[in-house]
Swiss-Prot record:
Name of the gene this protein is made from: nadD
Family from the record: Belongs to the NadD family.
One Pfam short name: CTP_transf_like
Protein species of origin: Clostridium botulinum (strain Langeland / NCTC 10281 / Type F)
Function of the protein: Catalyzes the reversible adenylation of nicotinate mononucleotide (NaMN) to nicotinic acid adenine dinucleotide (NaAD).
Record's keyword terms, sorted: ATP-binding, NAD, Nucleotide-binding, Nucleotidyltransferase, Pyridine nucleotide biosynthesis, Transferase
Recorded metabolic or biological pathway in which this protein acts: Cofactor biosynthesis; NAD(+) biosynthesis; deamido-NAD(+) from nicotinate D-ribonucleotide: step 1/1
The protein's name in its UniProt record: Probable nicotinate-nucleotide adenylyltransferase
The organism's taxonomic lineage, starting at the top: Bacteria, Bacillati, Bacillota, Clostridia, Eubacteriales
Any one GO BP annotation for this protein: NAD biosynthetic process
The protein's Enzyme Commission number: 2.7.7.18
NCBIfam families: cyt_tran_rel, nicotinate (nicotinamide) nucleotide adenylyltransferase, PRK00071.1-3
Length: 201
């Protein structure tokens, strides 16, 4: 069976931690492909200011262009309305029903995961993978959440440690506003694109 993963995010901007997570997932889950999906209009970030979708899409495209096992999809940014994860996963599952799908997202989603639209269907469609920038030290809240989901949905959440790179898009945006160096946080072409387009000032 072919294994593929969807790595969703706002990618505002994409940075080396995103790339590192994708490479880690390739090896750990024996993936043929990781599909980066820039978020369109996620319901949990509806009131947050975001860089226009076509600009975020272009940054992701530049970041992954040399890796043949990485691809990008504009499914969410071209879809109307709110970008629900269920709709995205359903779209890819219907396109490739025989593929074993993984969905990769950050640890912050754990706190509201059970409130996601059609979460039970999401667990049926894919293997759920959560990564943490801080590393997984059997935190009490994570243990409780794992048990709760296992009991309620009979599904095991997979975890990845992404603590090797302490980077966040928020941190990068703030450093740019403060006039600090950020080139070492992202692929060179993304950094040059940000400078050329005067982003995050």
């Amino acid at each position: 069976m072919i294994n593929k993963a969807i790595l969703g995010g706002t990618f505002d901007p994409i940075h080396n931690a995103h790339i590192n997570v994708a490479y880690e997932a390739l090896e750990r889950f024996n993936l043929e492909e990781v599909i980066f999906i820039p978020a369109g209009n996620p319901p949990h970030k509806i009131n947050l200011k975001k860089t226009p979708a076509h600009i975020r899409y272009e940054m992701v495209k530049l970041a992954i262009e040399k890796e043949t096992r990485f691809s990008i999809s504009d499914f969410e940014i071209k879809s109307k309305g709110l970008s629900y994860t269920y709709r995205t996963l359903k779209h890819f599952k219907e396109k490739e029903p025989e593929t074993n799908w993984y969905f990769i997202t950050g640890e912050d989603c754990l706190s509201y995961l059970e409130h996601w639209k059609y979460i039970d269907e999401i667990f049926n469609i894919c293997n759920f993978v959560i990564f943490s920038r801080e590393g997984f030290k059997e935190k009490e809240e994570i243990i409780k959440k794992k048990k709760s989901i296992l009991l309620k949905y009979r599904k095991e959440i997979l975890f990845m440690d992404a603590s090797i790179l302490d980077i966040s898009s928020t941190k990068i945006r703030n450093r740019i506003k403060e006039g600090k160096e950020v080139s070492f946080y992202m692929p060179d072409k993304v950094y040059k694109f940000i400078l050329q387009n005067n982003l995050y000032k």
